[in-house]
A protein has these predicted regions:
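Flexible "arm" and connector segments at domain edges
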Residues: 1-110
Length: 110
């Protein structure tokens, strides 16, 4: 049985994968942001012409579910590589953004 992946291990694997192929020179913030946008668009494409009801059931079709998981993985991989290049801790960035949003958009009081 494989271990449950954790973020630092996945980040190391991505860095090692790119380094082994000498891709580091291509991993500029601009290129990674562009690749992230392309992969996000590929995820959107899966849902483009689906009704809301169809989109809610997308994971019930094994072939489509596989495509969705692959695109999610691509988006996450490029986002993590982008963060590594710019020395951004993605979990800290997310936590800080949630804090700002909680202040900016307070929950209604009952």
């Amino acid at each position: 049985m494989t271990e449950h992946p954790d973020l630092p291990r996945l980040q190391r694997r991505l860095a090692e994968f790119a380094a082994a192929r000498d891709w580091g020179r291509y991993h500029t913030p601009k290129n990674l942001a562009s690749a992230l946008s392309v992969e996000s668009s590929e995820l959107v494409e899966i849902f483009q012409w689906l009704t809301p009801e169809e989109s809610a059931r997308v994971m019930s079709d094994p072939a489509t579910a596989h495509r969705v998981r692959d695109e999610v993985a691509d988006v996450l991989a490029y986002l993590l590589q982008f963060c590594a290049v710019l020395d951004i801790d993605p979990l800290t960035a997310l936590s800080e953004k949630i804090d700002r949003n909680e202040h900016r958009f307070p929950a209604p009081e009952d």
